[in-house]
Amino acid sequence: MPTAATPTGIELYYETIGSPADPPLLLVMGYGSQLIAWPRGFSELLAASGRFVIVFDNRDSGLSSKLDGAAVDTEAVMAAAGAGDLARARELAPYTLSDLADDCIAVLDALGIDRAHVLGASMGGMIAQQLAIERTERLLSLVSMMSTTGEPEYGRPTPEALEALLSPSPPEREAYIASAGEGLIWASRRYGDRARLEALAAESYDRCFYPEGVDRQLAAMLASGSRADGLRALELPTLVIHGLDDKLIPPDGGERTAELVPGARLMLVEDMGHDRPEPLWPVLVEAILDHTGREEAIPNILRAP
């Protein structure tokens, strides 16, 4: 089982797709999700087009290390962050987005990769942004997908989406699978697929059911604050992809990200929610390949399809 180790002893399970001779593309998954949430066919399309695709489980998810027993009071973290006391919020959180960004570096180091293109989705986009800010020299480019800047006024979920996101996961397998349909709230209105969501939930449950980890990941996001200043100073080719149907992180989160990063390209995708439906893979893959194949970011706004 391939794993990467951090200096603090965290073990990160990873998988690769494609040829190591191709430009490396690290995919960073989001809140409460395992690497299998990256559709295999999506990754294979990228690999078949000449990218060395790397996927991994964030800490506290999947087959990576779990911080068992590291209790966190998410309400206290939220209160501290909401009051502007990020120092207190970080004291209460077991780790932050910076630590999760360091985990990305550990994966690259394990593979002997000096620099990589990095694509992050949702919380993974936040991690990728943090990584780009703190370790710009390790990135070839950044793709921030369905994510936001950490500024509280942007990318705010609808009440219904937030309630569904924070609902406790049922411990019984069948109930857990049935609850996956709540994800239709933020999925593509045109391509939302309950059966697909339930199939992923079944695979995720059987691979690793670990609801304890989501509280610590939530605390990491809350305690990390705004990345606006770092994004303003970022000198890195950046593509921002956001679905116009997204109710979990609405499009203004992506628009704000692109506004802050100098030279960033913004791609607003019709019929895409907080998901990556298969009918949209070709346009998403084409945009990612185009972006990771150029040396300079070209200011532009795309609307697809």
List the predicted regions and their residue ranges.
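Flexible "cap/lid" loop of the alpha/beta hydrolase fold
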Residues: 133, 142-171
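Catalytic active-site module of serine/aspartate enzymes centered on a nucleophile-bearing elbow/loop
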Residues: 264-305
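Short beta-strand/loop motif that positions the catalytic acidic residue
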Residues: 234, 240-242
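Conserved HGGG/HGGXW glycine-rich cap/lid loop of the alpha/beta-hydrolase fold
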Residues: 8-87
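Conserved alpha/beta-hydrolase catalytic His-Asp/Glu region
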Residues: 175-216
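Conserved acidic catalytic loop of the alpha/beta-hydrolase fold
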Residues: 94, 98-116
